[in-house]
Regions:
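Short beta-strand-centered segments at strand-helix junctions
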Residues: 113-115, 225-236, 335, 421-424
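Eukaryotic endomembrane system proteins
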Residues: 185-196, 200-306
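Short secondary-structure boundary/capping segments
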Residues: 118-122, 223, 340-343
C-alpha cells in the first residue's frame, strides 16, 4: 500500500453527475474513486508506462478530432473515450427498477453506455462487473433504426446505417485507435440521481448505449460502462446541465489517494461546504465553440517564478493548430514542442544538483532521485489565461511521484502543431466549476474532501 501511494496513478477523466430539480437550489453529487484503487498493484514503472501509452493515444485522437472539426468533417473516432489509464469511477443508477453500475467518468466522451443484454444479445454475466438486463426495465425504450435520430443525429456517435426491418433498433459500433470498441444499440432510459440535499430524483429519456459487446481490457477494466461528459447534443452533460442549472463542477483528490478517499462531481450550484477557499477563486472564459466537444480555454503563456517563458503565440492559437483544453481523462499534461521545451528547460535550471535518472521502462523524459529534495526550491509554475486570470498548480502536480524516491516532470511533448492538454494531475486538489450557461471556468484550491 505504501508503494501504491507513491506512484503515479492513471486516473480519469472525471467525474460524475448531478444536480437538483426542486424549488430550493440543490444539486446532485456522486462520489468518484481512482481506477487504480480498485485494481491489483502493478510495478511502478509498468504503471507509468501504461499511463503514457494510454495518454499518448488519447492525445492523438483529441488532436485528430479537433483537426477534423475545424474542417467541418464528422469523424467516427476520437470522441475522447479514454483509453484505460487515467480514469476515475463513479456509480449511476439506470432503469426501472434502478440498477447500480460503476462507470468510467470521461469528459472527452459523448456517449454514455453500460454492459447490456437485450433480446438475447449480450453477456449473461461478466467477472467483477454488472450487466444491465434491458428487458427487465420498464422504462427502456430502444431508438428505431429508421428514425432521423438514428440516421442523422447519432451519426457522429457511430450509429450504423443498416436497417433490416422497421423494428430493428439503432445500432452502434464505437471504435478507438487503441483497439478498444463497444457494440450495441441506442435507447432512452431513466436515470435515478442522488441530490445534494439527500433526496433522489428520476430523469427520464436520457440517451444510453446498451453495449452487448466490448473489447479493450485496459480501457474497460473494472468498469460496467462509460459516463460521457463531453459537451454535445446527446451527452450526459448537455442533458444534465439543461435540467440542473447550467453548470457542473468536480474536484479530483491527490492522485496518490487510497480508495477510501472520494472526490466528486456535481451538476448544479456548488455547495458552499466545498468552496472553503473562496477568496482564492479565479474565473476565466470557457470557450465552448473553440474546440468542440472539448472544454477549451484561452491560455496565453506560462511563467516559472517571475519569468514569463518565451513561447511563440501560435502555440496557443487554434487557427495555427494549437489551442488548449482541460481533460480529466489524460493524467499528464501535453504541451506543443515549443512550450514543452521552454517549460522543462526552465524547471531543470532549478533541479541542478539533483541526480537525474532514466529508469528502465519509464517513458517520461525527466525524472530525478528526490528523496531529500525540498519542494520549496522549485519555483511556482503558472498558466496565464487571456484576461489576466492565473492558475498556479501545486508543485506536486508538476513534479509528480513516479516511484518510491523518484519524481518526474509531469509533461509530455506533443507534436509541433498540436492541442495542449491540461491533464488531471495538474488539476488535482482544485475545485473546477464549468458554467456552461455563462461560458466561464472558475477554480480554487480545495482538499476535495
Amino acid at each position: 500500500m505504501k508503494t501504491t501511494t507513491t506512484m503515479l496513478l492513471c486516473l480519469i477523466t472525471m467525474l460524475l453527475i448531478a444536480s437538483a430539480h426542486s424549488k430550493e437550489e440543490t444539486a446532485m453529487r456522486l462520489d468518484m474513486k481512482h481506477r487504480d484503487s480498485l485494481s491489483p498493484n502493478p510495478s511502478p514503472y509498468h504503471r507509468i508506462e501504461d499511463i503514457m501509452g494510454m495518454d499518448q493515444k488519447r492525445h492523438n485522437v483529441i488532436s485528430q478530432k479537433i483537426k477534423t472539426t475545424k474542417g467541418g468533417v464528422k469523424m467516427s473516432l476520437g470522441s475522447g473515450f479514454d483509453f484505460g489509464a487515467a480514469q476515475y469511477f463513479s456509480e449511476i443508477m439506470v432503469g426501472t427498477p434502478a440498477k447500480r453500475f460503476r462507470v468510467v467518468v470521461d469528459t472527452g466522451s459523448e456517449l454514455t453506455w453500460v454492459n447490456c443484454r437485450f433480446h438475447g444479445q449480450g453477456p449473461e454475466k461478466l467477472e467483477n462487473r454488472h450487466v444491465f438486463r434491458a428487458e427487465n426495465s420498464s422504462s427502456f425504450r430502444k431508438v428505431g433504426c429508421m428514425t432521423k435520430t438514428c440516421s442523422e443525429d447519432l451519426a457522429k456517435l457511430f450509429s450504423i446505417a443498416i436497417c433490416p426491418t422497421p423494428r430493428t433498433p439503432c445500432a452502434y459500433d464505437y471504435r478507438y485507435v487503441d483497439g478498444s470498441s463497444a457494440q450495441g444499440v441506442f435507447a432512452k432510459e431513466t436515470f435515478t440521481l442522488g441530490l445534494t440535499n439527500g433526496s433522489v430524483t428520476s430523469v427520464r429519456g436520457l440517451l444510453i448505449g446498451c453495449s452487448s459487446a466490448s473489447e479493450g481490457g485496459a480501457s474497460f477494466r473494472e468498469a460496467d460502462g462509460i459516463l460521457g461528459l463531453a459537451l454535445s447534443d446527446y451527452s450526459f452533460t448537455s442533458k444534465a446541465t439543461n435540467i440542473f442549472g447550467g453548470k457542473f463542477s468536480y474536484c479530483l483528490v491527490d492522485h496518490t489517494s487510497h480508495k477510501n478517499v472520494s472526490n466528486y462531481l456535481i451538476f448544479g450550484s456548488t455547495p458552499s461546504s466545498t468552496t472553503t477557499e473562496a477568496p482564492a477563486r479565479r474565473t476565466a472564459r470557457l470557450d465552448l465553440s473553440l474546440l468542440p466537444p472539448f472544454y477549451a480555454v484561452n491560455i496565453v503563456g506560462i511563467s516559472i517564478g517571475e519569468e514569463m517563458l518565451n513561447i511563440p503565440p501560435q502555440v496557443w492559437g487554434v487557427k495555427k493548430g494549437g489551442g488548449t483544453i482541460l481533460d480529466s481523462g489524460s493524467s499528464l499534461t501535453f504541451l506543443a514542442e515549443a512550450a514543452y521545451k521552454a517549460v522543462v528547460t526552465g524547471l531543470q535550471r532549478h533541479l541542478v544538483g539533483v541526480k537525474r535518472i532514466k529508469p528502465e521502462g519509464l517513458p517520461i523524459e525527466f525524472c530525478y532521485y528526490t528523496s531529500k529534495f525540498d519542494d520549496r526550491k522549485l519555483p511556482q509554475l503558472t498558466f496565464h489565461f487571456m484576461g489576466g486570470t492565473r492558475f498556479a498548480p501545486y508543485r506536486r502536480s508538476y513534479l509528480i511521484n513516479a516511484a518510491p524516491g523518484i519524481r518526474c516532470l509531469g509533461f509530455v511533448e506533443a507534436k509541433a502543431e498540436a492541442t495542449n492538454v491540461i491533464g488531471n494531475i495538474m488539476q488535482q486538489n482544485h475545485l473546477w466549476e464549468f458554467d456552461i450557461a455563462a461560458s466561464t471556468l472558475s477554480f480554487s484550491p480545495s482538499t476535495c474532501l
